[in-house]
UniProtKB/Swiss-Prot annotation:
Mn(2+) binds at residues 10, 64. GO terms for molecular function: metal ion binding; superoxide dismutase activity. The gene is sodA. Its EC number is 1.15.1.1. Fe(3+) binds at residues 10, 64. It is an enzyme of class 1 (oxidoreductase). This is Superoxide dismutase [Mn/Fe]. It comes from the Bacteria. Pfam families: Sod_Fe_C, Sod_Fe_N. The keyword Oxidoreductase applies. Destroys superoxide anion radicals which are normally produced within the cells and which are toxic to biological systems. Catalyzes the dismutation of superoxide anion radicals into O2 and H2O2 by successive reduction and oxidation of the transition metal ion at the active site.
């Protein structure tokens, strides 16, 4: 459970700053477009003078946007399709929770724990530092904390 102050800080300060800074970087190179998922999927193609700003702030925006999208005031159950995929990948839901908790609590400093679909179409748990996004590693995030 999250407290109100933490959510306000992350939404109104952190996320808003990531959006503003990503937009400022994109304004310097309108020719590359504004699709952050496409841009962050090929970081080396981002112009060098804005690359780190987009990795940090574009990643921060995408990470937080997914977090807000998945947040719910009500407890929800895992769908049968997701439960089956988790069982296949991790052996059980408990094993998945253990792996996800380890990814979240073993990250030194700031970062994210993720449930992603990897390049082979399989679920995996991973962690990224700061505002790095799994998209830059060719993985599709489906849960982030």
């Amino acid at each position: 459970q999250f407290d109100k102050e933490t959510m306000i800080l992350h939404h109104d300060k952190h996320h808003a700053t990531y959006v503003a800074n990503a937009n400022a970087a994109l304004e310097k190179h309108p020719e590359i477009g504004e699709n952050l998922e496409e841009l962050l999927a090929d970081v080396s193609a981002i112009p060098e003078d804005i690359r780190q700003a987009l990795v940090n702030n574009g990643g921060g925006h995408l990470n937080h946007a997914l977090f807000w999208e998945l947040l719910s005031p009500e407890k929800t159950e895992v769908t049968s399709d997701v439960a089956s995929a988790i069982d296949e990948a991790f052996g059980s839901f408990e094993s998945f929770k253990d792996a996800f908790t380890t990814a979240a609590t073993s990250r030194f400093g700031s970062g994210w724990a993720w449930l992603v679909v990897n390049k082979e179409g399989k679920l995996e748990v991973m962690s990224t530092a700061n505002q790095d996004t799994p998209i830059s590693e060719g993985k599709q995030p489906i849960l982030g904390l």
